[in-house]
Amino acid sequence: MDSEFLPGGSGGVWRVTDARGRARVLRPTGPWTPAVHALLAHLAARGLDGVPAVLGIDEEGREILEYLPGETLDPEVDAASDAALVAAAGWLRRFHEAARDFRPGRALWRQGEQELGADEVICHNDPGLYNWVLRDGEFAGMIDWDRAGPGRPIDDLAFLCWSGIPCCASCRLPTPRGGSRSPRAPTGTSNRSSCSRPSTRGWRSSTRAGTRASNAATPARSRSATPG
């Protein structure tokens, strides 16, 4: 059996491949794991794509998850295309809709023992670029569900957009994988700490990308309530 350490995430994550070429992911567990597994099972039953299936627990107490083939992004050196951003936001909407009837009562999540509020659903809570899976530049799924727990869908969307949309023209963003990116920016390494003064250059195209992402993630009946 071949194994490969996967950097990032919560640490201690390995991809193992058996003699038949089947890849699996081994990850450390915690007190929140049963609640996360129940969520993933619910999403699978609802037919949501782009979610790793839970395959069990190994003899060392690690969870065994389906491996989602593709590549992940490093926000410091990678960028996603506008098309991938819109697809990710659309997937986020489908996820929230699939999770809406998952009401586990008071459950232990990574954030502590919590119960869903009336206006809450179980959110991913960490849908940044680094947890996207891309195939040929296209959004294909979301990984690292350890921080899932009660929240508001708008907060998941805000996190996704904060991670995926450039905040100002001075950000030096790399060439996106798989398509165009708004606003256009020179190839290089991004540095969010340099975003001390906003620039209006590129705002129109950036706003359009953000609007497409918001529309993809927001049910039509709620769009009229979106500011602006």
Question: What are the functions of these language-model segments?
Answer:
Residues 157-189, 205-213:
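Active-site activation/catalytic loop segments of kinase-like enzymes and analogous catalytic loops
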Residues 208-228:
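ATP/Mg2+ or Mg2+-diphosphate-binding catalytic cores
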Residues 44, 96-100, 165:
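Protein kinase-like catalytic domain
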Residues 12-18, 54, 112-156:
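Active-site acidic catalytic loop and adjacent metal/ATP-binding pocket
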Residues 2-41, 66, 72-77:
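ATP-binding glycine-rich loop module of kinase domains
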Residues 75-108, 120-125, 130-135, 185:
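Conserved kinase catalytic-core helix
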Residues 44-57:
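Conserved HxN/HPN-centered segment at the entrance to the catalytic loop
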